[in-house]
Amino acid sequence: MTNLNKRPDWIKVKAPNSVEYYQTKDLIKNLRLNTVCEEAACPNIGDCWSRKHATVMILGAVCTRACRFCNVKTGRPDLLDPHEPRRLAEAVQKLNLQHVVITSVDRDDLEDGGASHFAECINEIRRSSPNTTIEILTPDFLRKEGAVEIIANAKPDVFNHNVETVPSLYKTIRPGARYYNSLSLLHNIKKLSPEIFTKSGMMVGLGEEINEVVQVMDDLREANVDFLTIGQYLQPTKSHAEIRKYVTPEEFKYLERIAKTKGFLMVSATPLTRSSYHADKDFQKLKGNYNIRLASM
């Protein structure tokens, strides 16, 4: 049995120390931007920042939710920064990004949940870097009328919203969210703008059963989600939800095989898979898989 107090070898990553890593870090700091890489203590930060890829977190650094898996601060949110979209667009230019991922904290305090701020960020990047493809990873916009339409009209290349875990664990792991609201959000984005690729992810190792994971796959395909990511849950601090299991690389391969039979355009399932990890390369693969499927129809 795996010792849950010690990370297995397949989870361990090298400490970041490259010149490019520190260049990315300095640029983010100088432009006063937040990143989910830092705030969520992502294990892949060294690899991504060394390749000058960072997932920018907009709408402040304080979340209005308190999910049991997440390391982002929770409490009274920051004031909305009207200059953030411009600074984000500047970062995209300076990092020479071909593909950018934008995420955010939950903003239940805002009338549209921050949807219009996402749209402004997309528009600013389109103006200054028209060839850069844009992926957004949004909150669920629970009870935020009109938010879905704002996002769909902004037309990101990829819309990502993570279901995070199986529905039976929502009350303990993601208490402020509703599983079927997340599915509805993904479904409605695709319905309003079919050309947008949709993506969702979940963590394993929280105590879920394999049949529950498979049911989530089916639910996501029912919502016409194109791309599924599955990764190992890692406990940020001792005050967060405990790890119930370290899922082995072989078990991840098994989950990937099952998911591929469901009809997703693309599946990424490894211990270190995260929503935006290798998102640039994955977007190219996603487009390629779509074109192959289109040609075979």
Swiss-Prot record:
PROSITE patterns: RADICAL_SAM (PS51918). Belongs to the radical SAM superfamily. Lipoyl synthase family. The gene is lipA. Its cofactor is [4Fe-4S] cluster. This is Lipoyl synthase. GO terms for molecular function: 4 iron, 4 sulfur cluster binding; lipoate synthase activity; metal ion binding. Residues 49-265 form the Radical SAM core domain. [4Fe-4S] cluster 2 binds at C63, C67, C70. It is found in: Cytoplasm. It comes from the Bacteria. Its main location: cytoplasm. [4Fe-4S] cluster 1 binds at C37, C42, C48, S276. Binds 2 [4Fe-4S] clusters per subunit. One cluster is coordinated with 3 cysteines and an exchangeable S-adenosyl-L-methionine. Keywords: 4Fe-4S, Cytoplasm, Iron, Iron-sulfur, Metal-binding, S-adenosyl-L-methionine, Transferase. Its EC number is 2.8.1.8. GO terms for cellular component: cytoplasm. It catalyses: [[Fe-S] cluster scaffold protein carrying a second [4Fe-4S](2+) cluster] + N(6)-octanoyl-L-lysyl-[protein] + 2 oxidized [2Fe-2S]-[ferredoxin] + 2 S-adenosyl-L-methionine + 4 H(+) = [[Fe-S] cluster scaffold protein] + N(6)-[(R)-dihydrolipoyl]-L-lysyl-[protein] + 4 Fe(3+) + 2 hydrogen sulfide + 2 5'-deoxyadenosine + 2 L-methionine + 2 reduced [2Fe-2S]-[ferredoxin]. Pathway: Protein modification; protein lipoylation via endogenous pathway; protein N(6)-(lipoyl)lysine from octanoyl-[acyl-carrier-protein]: step 2/2. The keyword Metal-binding applies. CDD domains: Radical_SAM. InterPro entries: Aldolase_TIM (IPR013785), Elp3/MiaA/NifB-like_rSAM (IPR006638), LIAS_N (IPR031691), Lipoyl_synth (IPR003698), rSAM (IPR007197).
